[in-house]
Amino acid sequence: MARQKLSMDGNTAAAHVSYAFTEVAGIYPITPSSPMADYVDQWSASGKNILGKPALNIFGTPVKVMEMQSEAGAAGTVHGSLAAGAMTTTYTASQGLLLMIPNMYKIAGELLPCVFHVSARCVASHALNI
């Protein structure tokens, strides 16, 4: 079987790789990380990945995507699903990461392994709100 090669941007590549290792994705769309969450949500809903094959993670199941009302809600979802034992991830940008800090302290304190996919964008120092 020949390998299939695709040319893609960084958001697509990160989403493709993260999908394989994720059971639950807690998302809130925020530019410039929105495409990563959108791809994961699209693949989970349609049942097909970027290659047109069944969209299953390494556990043989589709990713459960939970879109929340804010970045803080997405971080809470990540914390809760990690505590329940699920392999969990989220996608955010630098400014949204600030809203996740309280939950990140809880996640770190409980030694729960997870991945936060953070796309590059500077944190606004003149206004620490979104």
What are these regions (language model features)?
Residues 1-130:
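Thiamine diphosphate
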